[in-house]
Structure formats: structure tokens, C-alpha cells
Swiss-Prot record:
Binds to 23S rRNA. Forms part of two intersubunit bridges in the 70S ribosome. One of its GO terms (cellular component) is cytosolic large ribosomal subunit. InterPro entries: Ribosomal_uL14, Ribosomal_uL14_arc, Ribosomal_uL14_CS, Ribosomal_uL14_sf. This is Large ribosomal subunit protein uL14. It comes from the Archaea. SUPFAM superfamilies: Ribosomal protein L14. It holds the Pfam family Ribosomal_L14. GO terms for biological process: translation. Belongs to the universal ribosomal protein uL14 family. The gene is rpl14.
Length: 132
């Protein structure tokens, strides 16, 4: 896991619903915790692109539903600025189910993946179809 060069806003608080962008059988995820988050008093933990979050599956196949998993956020609607000055935003909030080290459980990723997430987690970058 490498550091991210862009300063990404943490736009997804706990309780946010995400689209699952892989083929593990999950369709909708809910963030219940953010791994490594150290906040200020009474602030909700929040995450952005490239963060590892703890999620529960709200919609999907019965085998994967109602369980707690790790996931990496690969897209967010809130725009962020890259060091070269370009601004990036996606049309949905999406994550990929992984293990605690950031290795994906699925074998394919649907849709675009942010370059920051692909650089930080190389296994996600190798199975991504499009990197933006």
C-alpha cells in the first residue's frame, strides 16, 4: 500500500451506501467503519478514494449478504484535485470488496477505477478494466 499524491476529500461518512463494482455477488454496500481513521471529537468517520473501509452487504446474493467485509473505495462523486491541476469526479460512489490487505476477492471490476486507488493497491489496478 503506497501513499496517495492527491489530497482527496473524505466525502463518504459512515452509513453511506456504495455500489459494489466487482463480481463477488454484492450489489450495494454500507460503510460501517473506516480503517485507520483518527478523527476529532464527535466527528463521523469518513472515507475517500483509496481508503480501506469496513462494509456490510445490503443487497446481493444470500451467501454474501449480512456479513462484514473490507472494501477499497474506487470512485466517489465529490470532485478532488490532482497535483497537475485536473479535477476528477465520478457519477457514483463505488467500492471493491477486498481482504484486510487490500487484495480483491472478485476477479473483475466493472466501470472505471480512480488512478489513486489503482496506484495504492496494485492488485486492484491489474484487474481494473478502465483506470481514470
Amino acid at each position: 500500500m503506497k501513499a496517495i499524491r492527491a489530497n482527496i476529500p473524505r466525502a463518504l461518512p459512515t452509513g453511506a451506501r456504495l455500489v459494489c463494482a466487482d463480481n463477488t455477488g454484492a450489489r450495494e454496500l454500507e460503510i460501517i467503519a473506516v480503517k485507520g481513521y483518527k478523527g476529532v471529537r464527535r466527528r463521523y468517520p469518513a472515507a475517500g478514494v483509496g481508503d480501506i473501509v469496513v462494509v456490510t452487504v445490503k443487497k446481493g446474493t444470500p451467501e454474501i449478504r449480512k456479513q462484514v467485509h473490507y472494501a477499497v473505495i474506487v470512485r466517489q462523486r465529490k470532485e478532488y484535485r490532482r497535483p497537475d491541476g485536473t479535477r476528477v469526479k465520478f457519477e457514483d460512489n463505488a467500492a471493491v470488496i477486498t481482504n484486510e490487505r487490500g487484495e480483491p476477492r472478485g476477479s473483475e471490476i466493472r466501470g472505471a477505477v480512480a488512478r489513486e486507488a489503482a496506484e495504492r493497491f496494485s492488485k486492484i489496478g491489474t484487474i481494473a478494466s478502465v483506470i481514470v
